[in-house]
Every structure is written in C-alpha cells, then in structure tokens.
Amino acid sequence: MKFDILTIFPNIFQSYFNESILKRAQKNGLIKIASHNLRNFTADKHHKVDDSPYGGGPGMVIKIEPIFKAVQHLKVKSHKALPAGRQVKTRVILFSTRGKKLDSKVAKRLSKYDQLILICGRYEGVDERVAQYIADEEISIGDYVLSGGELPAMILVEAVSRYLPGVLGKYESLEDIKGSYPVYTKPEIFKPRTPPRARLARGGKNPAKGEAHQRRQALRTWKVPKILLSGNHKKINEWRKIHGCL
C-alpha cells in the first residue's frame, strides 16, 4: 500500500510516521508513505499555490492547477512502477468537513486499494473543482474545523494501515480494539495518597484537618473489578461486551 500525501507542509508528518506501528510497517515494506509539496507543482517563480476566491470572501483558496498536476504525476509514477498489464487501484481522497465520516468500515474499504492519494487543504479550503473532478471522495474525521488536512491524513494512514496483513504485531489486535472496553493493570487495589490541601495552602501543619484528611485517604481505594480477576474468560468477555463502547 502506498500513501501519497499532497500538502504545503510536507515535513509535518515525519515525527508521527517514524514511530511505533507505522515505522515498523514501513521498515518491513508493508506500506510506503510519501509527502509531496504542492509548491513543486506550480508554474510561477514564486511557487504560489493559493489565490483569492471568485465572488469575494475572506482568506485564500488552494488552486486547482498544482493539485491536478500532482495527482496526475503520482498516478503515472505508480503505473510505471508496476509490471506491464497490471492496473494500479488508486483512490484520490480530499479531506473536507462535509465528507463521509471516517470509521472502521471506511478504513477497511480503503485498505483494498494499492495507492491512496490524500489531498490536504489549507487556508479557506481548495478550489471546488478538486472535489468535483479530481477527488474520488471526500472524507471527514469529525464535525469540527481544523487548520488543514494534515492531521486527518495522519489518522487515515494509521486507520487504514491497521487492516493490512502483517502491520499489527503479535500483541496488537484489530478486533479487540484497545479502548473499546475498560482495561486495568497492576496493582489490583490502588490507594491514592495526596498531601492535605490545608498544608499545601498554608505552608504549614494543621493537626485537625490533617487527621480528617488521613481518614478520608484511608477510605479511598480504587479497585479492579473482581470479574477480571476470576480467570473465567467467558464471563470476562461478557463483561467486556456489556461495558464496551463499540
């Protein structure tokens, strides 16, 4: 799987993609991730990628020309890299607040492609003709506005990569998604101990309040649910289904 990201901030991805699961997947040749500077696909000497919108309005808009050139370049490059006769399954995605919500079903569907070209907007968005004629679909990560599509691109790359064979390690599970149900670890019983607020506030000791604080502390214990300590995996799985969020 090849991820090609079109952006005006290509260096923003390096730290995230060079850690953990994605770093290992790239090292093992399971995925390739490349960020491409849209300014390299401009024709003017200033490498201008934006302009003011027709009809007026605040801000600037990413132009269609560099995006079109970049997408065509990446498609041709991928086609040439394959043996003669084989077609590259490519999907061009534009990140947009009005797009389809990214969820596990969308990620799994996208994992069937050979190449995903991800278009990251900036400023006030991109020329609408990108959505109309270049992108195959628009995707959103939620009902809120971000400065650009770079963060959604990072999220999509990891979400899709997890569905590719070999990407997840021995102790990582796709079906039992971490965080889909409550998880606990040692100690079985945790007794939090914090300094008395009176002492912190006044910079000294207050015997009466100190004793009350100690009594309250003695009553505070945070325990692991007994069912998880039972060793009964059938009941544990039932508990997880009841308390799960997926």
Predicted regions and their residues:
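N-terminal nucleotide/polyanion-binding subdomain common to many enzyme families
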Residues: 1-74, 218, 229, 235-236, ...
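S-adenosyl-L-methionine/SAH cofactor-binding core of RNA-modifying enzymes
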Residues: 62-79, 88-122, 128, 165
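Short Gly/Ser/Thr- and charged-rich N-terminal loops/segments
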Residues: 78, 82-89, 193-220
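Internal, active-site/partner-interface "lid" segment
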Residues: 151, 163-193, 220
